[in-house]
Amino acid sequence: MKTALVTGSGGLIGSQSVIKLVEAGWHVVGVENDMRASFFGPEASTRPVSDRLASTLDEFEPVELDIRDAEGVNRVFADRKVELVVHTAAQPSHDWAARDPQTDFGVNAIGTLNLLEAARNHAPDAPFIFCSTNKVYGDTPNFLPLIETDTRLELPEDHEYFDGIDTGMSIDHSTHSLFGVSKASADLLVQEYGRYFEMPTVCFRGGCLTGPQHAGAELHGFLAYLMKCVVTGRPYTVFGYDGKQVRDNIH
């Protein structure tokens, strides 16, 4: 049986990856340490999802590990024949990153470097899938020729990005936020390991992801958090741009 390693296995994308891989016949090693609870509080904890995966999936092997621990990460790879890496673990919030830039960079950039090095040393042929973010583009999209209507900001229908921004957009010369910088650093590392060491790496620059396992909190996971506010009657605040910003959600 093939072995896949999924980091952030209790999170939204990580947990769905675990389920799909197990269904496809893989043995899945899930790396998780519930840092989301320390970032955003107990309502954002991934522990319930991790416990549910462990109790319902026979081929799921949970490993409690902080990806900033280079020796621990290396040991996980050295002790197993890993044939696929799905790296979703991250500190995912702009605001939180500004509170503690060192932790943000440590998790997002150094943690990714630790995984890449371990993969290079022990599983160089394993596809390495990295969940990057559209925040690597910084505020460049704000300088597009946006049209302000009564309810939203929109691009002209004949604009090349009307149906979405592709990876051709530059990530340079923009304000990224500290979170965007740490994720852009990781994104570039994943690309460079692919090119320089000829490893099969890929970056997915998603944004506004949601789904049934999302532990939404005010600082991250806005759609899940919005639904939570609707159900509980809690006020929901939209910040900036007069509430006219437009986001495409990926389920």
Regions from the PLM with identified roles:
Residues 1-207:
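N-terminal Rossmann-like NAD(P)+-binding domain of SDR-like oxidoreductases, especially those catalyzing
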Residues 97, 163-177, 201-215, 226-250:
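A conserved pocket-lining segment of Rossmann-fold NAD(P)-dependent short-chain dehydrogenase/reductase
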Residues 42, 143-145, 216-225:
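A glycine/serine/threonine-rich, flexible loop-to-helix segment
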Residues 131, 221, 245:
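A conserved catalytic-core signature of glycosyltransferases
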